[in-house]
From Swiss-Prot:
This is HLA class II histocompatibility antigen, DO alpha chain. GO terms for biological process: adaptive immune response; antigen processing and presentation of exogenous peptide antigen via MHC class II; negative regulation of antigen processing and presentation of peptide antigen via MHC class II; peptide antigen assembly with MHC class II protein complex; positive regulation of immune response; positive regulation of T cell activation; regulation of T cell differentiation. Residues 241-250 are cytoplasmic. The gene is HLA-DOA. Keywords: Adaptive immunity, Disulfide bond, Endosome, Glycoprotein, Immunity, Lysosome, Membrane, MHC II, Signal, Transmembrane, Transmembrane helix. Residues 26-217 are extracellular. Belongs to the MHC class II family. It comes from Homo sapiens (Human). Residues 205-217 are annotated as: Connecting peptide.
Length: 250
């Protein structure tokens, strides 16, 4: 699905510094942030994020209206009412017009994303694995990511993360595809974004070692046989010489 242009985007971030080293210092042992939270007019979507030391703990998606923990284990020791995140998104939405006027209606630059595809673990034929499509350098956070197998769209088992913020105020996103490696299948991660002139395809296929040709196999066998014959002849000669020497009277 092609992306249509037209977006109003608002951001909000609240930082919390823990254990500052000295009065007025900007450095801290740890840093937590409620945000970045954003709302965008394109598709009426938004996200509220809580981070600790620049690592996302959870996010609240406007459409899902629920807190999604980056790792399920995080939800075992902490709780968060998603209404708090939704309220933050609503506040940004309510002030979008003001933000647009203050920016003098200047449009942000669409940044081309970078795409990398790699397997989760060592690939073995016939053994289930997961392909990971890492898309970073995203801005604005509006993107379409599609998996293709042999040129055909794949949706079964596909999973994705929310947008992860980066220190440079860009975003990162991960897409996952369960698959069973086969020498016949090839995969592509297709990315559509306003920073790209055309959909970007990042290719992946299993690299199967090429066996040596028949001529090479024949040469290897011939060399092995020749070495064996030479060893046999040398051994025979040594035995004969040893027998002759032992039979000579001293």
């Amino acid at each position: 699905m092609a992306l249509r242009a037209g977006l109003v985007l608002g951001f909000h971030t609240l930082m919390t510094l823990l254990s500052p080293q000295e009065a007025g210092a900007t450095k801290a042992d740890h840093m937590g942030s409620y945000g970045p939270a954003f709302y965008q007019s394109y598709g009426a979507s938004g996200q509220f994020t809580h981070e600790f030391d620049e690592e996302q703990l959870f996010s609240v998606d406007l459409k899902k209206s629920e807190a999604v923990w980056r790792l399920p284990e995080f939800g075992d020791f902490a709780r968060f009412d998603p209404q708090g995140g939704l309220a933050g998104i609503a506040a940004i939405k309510a002030h979008l017009d003001i933000l647009v006027e203050r920016s003098n209606r200047s449009r942000a630059i669409n940044v081309p994303p970078r795409v990398t595809v790699l397997p989760k673990s060592r690939v073995e034929l016939g053994q289930p694995n997961i392909l990971i499509c890492i898309v970073d350098n995203i801005f604005p956070p509006v993107i379409n990511i599609t998996w293709l197998r042999n040129g055909q769209t794949v949706t079964e088992g596909v999973a994705q993360t929310s947008f992860y913020s980066q220190p440079d105020h860009l975003f990162r996103k991960f897409h996952y595809l369960p698959f069973v490696p086969s020498a016949e299948d090839v995969y592509d991660c297709q990315v559509e974004h306003w920073g790209l002139d055309a959909p970007l395809l990042r290719h992946w296929e299993l690299q199967v070692p090429i066996p040596p040709p028949d001529a090479m196999e024949t040469l290897v066998c011939a060399l092995g046989l020749a070495i064996g014959l030479v060893g046999f002849l040398v051994g025979t000669v040594l035995i004969i010489m040893g027998t002759y020497v032992s039979s000579v009277p001293r």
